[in-house]
Amino acid sequence: MTTSATLFYRAQQVIPGGVNSPVRAFKGVGGTPVFIEKANGAYIFDIEGKQYIDYVGSWGPMILGHNHPSILSAVLKIAENGLSFGTPTPLEIELAELICQLVPSIEMVRMVNSGTEATMSAIRLARGYTKRDKILKFEGCYHGHSDSLLVKAGSGSLTLGQPSSPGVPEDFAKHTITCEYNNLQSVKNAFEQYPDQIACVIVEPVAGNMNCILPKQDFLQGLRQLCNEYGSLFIIDEVMTGFRVALGGAQSYYEVTPDLTTLGKVIGGGMPVGAFGGKKEIMQYIAPTGPVYQAGTLSGNPIAMSAGIACLNELKKEGNEQRLAMLTKKLALGLKNLANQHNIPLVVNYVGGMFGIFFTTQNEVTSYQQAIQCDIERFNLFFHKMLEQGVYLAPSAFEAGFMSLAHTDADIDRTLQAADIAFASLRSSSFS
C-alpha cells in the first residue's frame, strides 16, 4: 500500500469521503488521490517525493506558480504584524484599488473569503437592488455551493429549477431558472415568460466546470442586451477566469461590460479570498451604506490581501499576459497534433491560461450536452497514464486545466512527450 493510500484510509475515518472538496477524492477518474507534501514553481511533490508538472494549480489560484517569492515575502512580512485584526486596513484599500484599475467595470468592490461567498452575495445584492426574486443561470455552469445556485434544469428547454443536491428546498430552487449555455434563444424565452421577475443573469464567461467551453460569438453581448431590455442585472462570474483569460478578465477579452463581477482564486495569490464588485450605484446598496446585508469575520484579512496585491502586481508586468497565453496555446496545439498522429479524435479548447481536453468525435464542444457526450472512460485512462509519467491533470473530465507563468517551454515539451506515450496506449476505436 502506498503512503497516499494509507493516508487516504486514515482521512476517510475522520473526514467525509476523506477529502475537503469532492473532486479531490478521484471519484471521477478512479484510483487513490495523490497526497501532496510541497510545491514549488510549476511542480508539486507527493508524500513519497515524486515530482509532477502541475496543471491544476490549486484549481486556479497559482497563476504565478507555487511558492512565488514575491507572494511568499509579502505574506511573511505582514504575518509578523499579526494574522487578523477584524478592522479596516490599508492593504484592503490597496487591493481594491488594484482590482478597480485592472477591471474597469468594477467601480467599487467588497472583499469576502471565497468564490461561493462572492456569488452568493452578488445574487443577494441583485435581488435587493432590483426587488425581484428569480435568477437565471446556465446548465453546466458552477457558481459555488450556495442554495440558489445548486440548481439544475428540469425537463424541457425552459423550466424552473430543481435542486441538484439534497438539502436545497424545492420552494427555494423554484426561483432559479436554468438555460442552455451558448443558446441565446433559451434566454430570450425565459425573459419572455418572466419579463418582470428576473433579478439577474449570472454566467461563467468561459464555462470551466464542464471542462473548458468558450462562449460563441455574440453570446455574452446578447446576454448584456437582454438584461438591458428587461431591467435585470448582468453578473459575470470571473472567479475562475478573472486575470487568467486576460489581465482585465474574460469581460475584457470578449469586450462585454457586466453590472456586477465576482472574483476569487487569483486575487488571493493562494490564500482564501473572494470579491464582488461593479457599478458604484449598485454596490452602495450593500450594508453599511445600503439595506442589503453582507458581512464576514475574516473578510479583508491582511495576509490574504498582501498575497493578492503581490500576485496582481506580478501579473501586471509587461509580457506576462502574452506569455501565459502562448504557453497554453503551445500545449493545446501540441496535444491536438499528437492526437491526430495517433488517430484519436480529440477537441482541445483553450483561451488565456485555461484549457480543456475532450475525447470526442464531435467537431466542437460548445455546450453542456456536448460535453457529457465525450468519452469519459478514455479521459480517465489518459489521466492515469499522464499521472504515472509525472503530469498532474485535473482528476475529472469536467474540470478545466490551468497554466502558470512558472511553466517553461521545457515543461510543455515534457508534457507532450508524456502525452505521446499516453495516446499510444489508448485505442482509437469504440467512441460513442
UniProtKB/Swiss-Prot annotation:
The UniProt catalytic activity note for this protein reads: (S)-4-amino-5-oxopentanoate = 5-aminolevulinate
EC id: 5.4.3.8
Query: What is an annotated GO biological process for this record, any one?
Result: protoporphyrinogen IX biosynthetic process
Per UniProt, subcellular location reads as: Cytoplasm
Specify the enzyme's EC class, one word: isomerase
Q: Which Gene Ontology molecular function entries are recorded, alphabetically?
A: glutamate-1-semialdehyde 2,1-aminomutase activity; pyridoxal phosphate binding; transaminase activity
* Residue positions where N6-(pyridoxal phosphate)lysine is found in the record: K265
Keywords in UniProt for this one?
Answer: Cytoplasm, Isomerase, Porphyrin biosynthesis, Pyridoxal phosphate
Locate the coiled-coil region(s) and give their ranges: none
Question: Its domain of life?
Answer: Bacteria
**Has the keyword Isomerase been applied to this entry?**
yes
Q: In which pathway does it act?
A: Porphyrin-containing compound metabolism; protoporphyrin-IX biosynthesis; 5-aminolevulinate from L-glutamyl-tRNA(Glu): step 2/2
- Chief location bin: cytoplasm
The family database entries (CDD domains) matched by this protein are listed as: OAT_like (cd00610)
Q: SUPFAM superfamilies, per this entry?
A: PLP-dependent transferases (SSF53383)
Q: Which family does it belong to?
A: Belongs to the class-III pyridoxal-phosphate-dependent aminotransferase family. HemL subfamily.
In Swiss-Prot or TrEMBL terms, this protein is called Glutamate-1-semialdehyde 2,1-aminomutase
Source species: Histophilus somni (strain 2336)
Source species taxonomy: Bacteria, Pseudomonadati, Pseudomonadota, Gammaproteobacteria, Pasteurellales
